[in-house]
Structure formats: C-alpha cells, structure tokens
Amino acid sequence: MKLSDFIAANNYTLIDFWASWCGPCRMEMPNVVAAYAKYKAKGFGIVGVSLDNDVESWKKAIKDLNITWPQMSDLKGWQCEGAALYGVRAIPATLLVSKDGTIVARDLRGEDLEAKLAELMK
C-alpha cells in the first residue's frame, strides 16, 4: 500500500515518523495511542513510518507500545524515502493531513495534537 491510500481512507490522517530506538518517540506514543482510540471512529487514521533499520526491533516496539494502526518501513533508517519526501530531519515528527492530501499541521504532540483533533472532529 501507498501512503496516499491511507490518507484517502480517512478524514484526517496523522503520518507519524518514529523509530524503536528514539526515546522521545517512545515517550510520545501513549498520547498518539490515546488520540487514535478517541478519534478513529470519527474518521481519524494514523500511519506510522518507521526509521528503523532492524525489523525485529521495529516489530517489538510496535507490540510493546500497543500500536494498532498501519505501519510502514523500508528499513533504511535515515535514508527512508518517506522522510526525505516530507523533509523530516528529526524524530518524532508528525504531519496531520486532510483527505485531499493537504498538510493541516506539523509536529503536533501531546495536548497540541488533542486540541487540533478536537477542533477538526467537531
């Protein structure tokens, strides 16, 4: 599947760039899990784009962090094509994208992510 397939399937999609070895990514993940649980029935989706190199570490982190949304990785680390396409130079990084592909917000975390979703999902 392509990123555009996930985006077209939801009213809003969070593209979450992360990696199993990224401490700040792991710390933020409970906020992302909570947002997904709260808003997925209202047309909110997430697709994770991992900057991992090791498939086992990546899969273990998905399980350990209770990540239930689709995940993608080319296992190329910082050479990830998706990261290059969206200009991601540090993680965690997020893009909130509308159904038509418009970037609505970048790098929302914690309360900022919740506030933006509450505004959009009225």
Residue spans for each PLM region:
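A short beta-strand-turn-helix
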Residues: 1-13
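Short beta-strand segments
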Residues: 16, 47-50, 72
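Thiol/disulfide oxidoreductase modules built on the thioredoxin-like
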Residues: 65-67, 74-121
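Extracytoplasmic and endomembrane cell-envelope/extracellular-matrix remodeling and assembly machinery
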Residues: 9, 54, 113-115
